[in-house]
Amino acid sequence: MSYSGKIESRMHPFLRWAGGKKWLVRKIISSFDVSQFSSYHEPFVGGGAMLFYFQPNNAYISDSNEQLIQTYITVRNSIDDVIEVIRGFGRTEDDYYFVRGLQTDDSVVRAAKFIYLNQLSYNGIYRVNSKGGYNVPWGKRVNYQFDFENLTKVSNYLQGVQIDSMDFEDCIDNVHQNALVFLDSPYTHSKILNGFIQYNQKVFTEEDQSRLSYLIDRIKERGAYYILTNADHPRIKEIFDKHDNVIPISRSSGIGGKNAQRGEYEECIFTNTNLTL
C-alpha cells in the first residue's frame, strides 16, 4: 500500500470528533511507514485523522454511526453541492438552531447540516436525543470559516476509499494478509474513575471490548497487523493481553464537554507492528 499521489499532505480531517488521533499522527508520521502494508482498515473512523494524514491508497473505512458514514459518502459523491448548501447557512445563534431543526431526507442537505453543526456546536460533540435528533447547543463560533479547499481535497481522496456503515467486527471480511487495521475504539475512563465512557453516540461496553479482542485474534490469524488505542485500565490490559507490544502514553485530553472529563489521561497502544513513539 502506498500513499495517494493525488492529495496534498496538508489535507486534514473535516470534522471535529471526540477521541480524535491528531496527537498520535504527529508522533508517528515521520517514523511509521504505512506503505509497508497491503491495505488499510479503520472500523471506528470518526474524524479520520490517521486516514487523512497518511492517505493510504487501498483504504476501507467504516463506523456504526450511520449519519457520520452517510456524510462521508455524500462528501465523496457530491462535494460541490454540499459546499453550496453550507455557504447558504448563516452563522448566528438563530441560524444555528434553525439548521439544527431542519428535517430533510435530502442526502446533500443532511451532510451539509452534519458538517455545519459539527463545526459550530459546543466542542464539536456528537450527541443525539432519544428520537435521534442532534441536541448539542450553539458553540458561539460566529467568525468560524469553513475550509472548503480542504473539503474538496477530502472528497478527491475519498474517491478511492471503500466506505461502509457497519459493526466493527464486520470489517474482517476485507482484511487479508499484510493488511493494517487501526482500531480507535471508545475508551473506558482512567483506572481512577474505573468506569466506561460514553461519547459520540453509544456506550462501548465491556462486552464490546471483548468482541474487539476477538477481532484482533482474527486479524492476527489472517497474517495481518493491528494498532489499538485504548485506556490504561487494568481490565483493558487484561482483555487485550496478546503478548504483543504495549506502549504506555500519558497526555492531556478533553473528551466531550464536561470539565470532569478533562485532564491527564493514561492511555496505551497495543500493536503487533514495529510502531514506536
PLM feature spans:
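Conserved S-adenosyl-L-methionine
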Residues: S31, F37-R91
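Short, well-ordered beta-strand micro-motif
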Residues: Y116, I269-N272
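Short, glycine/acidic-enriched loop or turn micro-motifs at the edges of active sites
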Residues: V45, E66, D170, Y187, ...
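Flexible, glycine-/basic-rich loop-and-beta segments that form/coincide
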Residues: N274-L277
